[in-house]
């Protein structure tokens, strides 16, 4: 292979690695939603909407992180619990415990509307966050499509270069033939 061809092929391979690395980072990103937090009014019932990207109906990886702290005395223990209920009123996730027990529950749930019901004793602060990884279900498809698109661009670029080179060569031949006939 010519040195120029090796360099060109190497650059396309580097581009393929860069595209897939960027997509891997995008697909791993989480969208965080504050459900209840310190300094905000506590809402015992929160609507939670899980939306898929690009019309996918695949289950979305989620994580609900909760922490309950007693307002008067952080070392004091009080009861706390929460339930995540889907549109058909079925409990899909739940947790029960006491204050000062931070917990993170992970699950994969289908897109849809959910309700988070939280029950706490008086003078308890609820800190609840929902993290969704919306691109995770289509991560593999994204890698395949982006890789195929990059390969198509690489072959298209190569074909375009060859086409232009042939056109220039044909034009030069026609010009040299017309000069000979003059």
Where are these regions (language model features)?
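Selective detector of the "anchor" transmembrane alpha-helix that sits immediately C-terminal
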Residues: 139-163
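Short, highly charged, low-complexity non-transmembrane loops/tails of multi-pass membrane proteins
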Residues: 168-178
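Hydrophobic secretory-pathway targeting helix
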Residues: 1-35
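Membrane-proximal low-complexity regions enriched in glycine and acidic/polar residues
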Residues: 25-86
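Conserved small/polar residues in nucleotide/adenosyl-binding loops
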Residues: 180-182
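Short tyrosine-centred short linear motifs in exposed loops/low-complexity segments
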Residues: 56-62, 110-114, 120, 124
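Extracytoplasmic/lumenal ectodomains and periplasmic regions of secretory and membrane proteins
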Residues: 71-119
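Short, aromatic-rich amphipathic segments at membrane interfaces
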Residues: 116-144
């Amino acid at each position: 292979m010519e040195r120029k061809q090796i360099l060109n092929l190497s650059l396309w391979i580097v581009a393929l690695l860069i595209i897939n690395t960027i997509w891997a980072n995008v697909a791993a990103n989480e969208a965080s939603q504050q459900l209840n937090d310190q300094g905000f009014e506590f809402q015992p019932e929160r609507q939670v909407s899980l939306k898929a990207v690009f019309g996918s109906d695949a289950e979305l990886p989620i994580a609900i992180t909760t922490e309950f702290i007693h307002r008067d005395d952080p070392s004091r223990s009080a009861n706390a619990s929460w339930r995540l209920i889907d549109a058909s009123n079925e409990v899909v996730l739940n947790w029960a415990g006491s204050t000062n027990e931070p917990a993170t529950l992970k699950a994969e749930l289908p897109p849809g509307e959910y309700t988070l019901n939280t029950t706490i004793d008086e003078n308890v602060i609820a800190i609840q966050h929902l993290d969704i990884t919306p691109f995770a279900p289509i991560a593999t498809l994204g890698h395949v499509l982006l890789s195929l698109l990059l390969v198509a661009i690489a072959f298209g670029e190569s074909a375009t270069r060859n086409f232009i080179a042939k056109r220039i060569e044909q034009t030069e031949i026609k010009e040299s033939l017309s000069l000979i006939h003059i």
